[in-house]
């Protein structure tokens, strides 16, 4: 299974060092949504500060970008 990374990005990047092995890009996008919701549960102050979850594959290519602002 491919390895995906989920970094929290604003002016600085908090890297996902370990990543997660997932079936495909769709599952990675679903995981990004789960991670974003968890981040906002723990740090609601980040919602309106232009943070996003950057999903990359094992080759470092961007798969998806999920702005925290759109999470309800």
Give the role of each language-model region.
Residues 1, 24-27, 58-60:
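A short, structured loop/turn motif at beta-sheet edges
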Residues 2-4, 18, 49-51:
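A generic structural signal for short beta-strands and their flanking turns/coil linkers
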Residues 24-44:
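A short, charged, amphipathic alpha-helix used as a generic interaction element across diverse proteins
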Residues 14-25:
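A short, exposed loop/beta-hairpin motif centered on an aromatic-Gly-Thr core
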Residues 1-15:
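Short aromatic-glycine-(Arg/Gly/Cys) micro-motifs in beta-strand/loop hairpins
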Residues 10, 18, 42:
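Glycine-rich, flexible loop/turn motifs
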Residues 38-72:
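Short, mixed-charge low-complexity intrinsically disordered segments
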